[in-house]
């Protein structure tokens, strides 16, 4: 067995094992409504300053509840949500804001690049 195929099989095994573990934790919490806190936090891969979505945890019950408790840390996220929803709703000649820009570039990766750029800019 070549080292490349061994590495790929090991990587596949790790990914399948991690996915199964996450699914089991999720199904246990769905079956047991008394466990409202699973200890899950959303974290970004970078070492920069944390955004509001990174600080949000399941214990907050809802995103709107978190926004009401931490209004200063979510100013950029709420602005981005409002601007993207308003640009999608306003149409001029069949063009829909950000979605049209991604489709004009052509190719399937353009929307992915737009999303990555918007996450980096936050």
Swiss-Prot record:
Entry-linked Pfam families: Svs_4_5_6
Intrachain disulfide bonds: none
Species: Mus musculus (Mouse)
UniProt signal peptide: 1-21
Keywords in alphabetical order: Secreted, Signal
Region feature (Disordered): 23-122
Bias (Polar residues): 27-37
Protein name: Seminal vesicle secretory protein 5
Known tissue expression: Testis.
Family the UniProt entry places it in: Belongs to the SVP2/SVP5/SVP6 family.
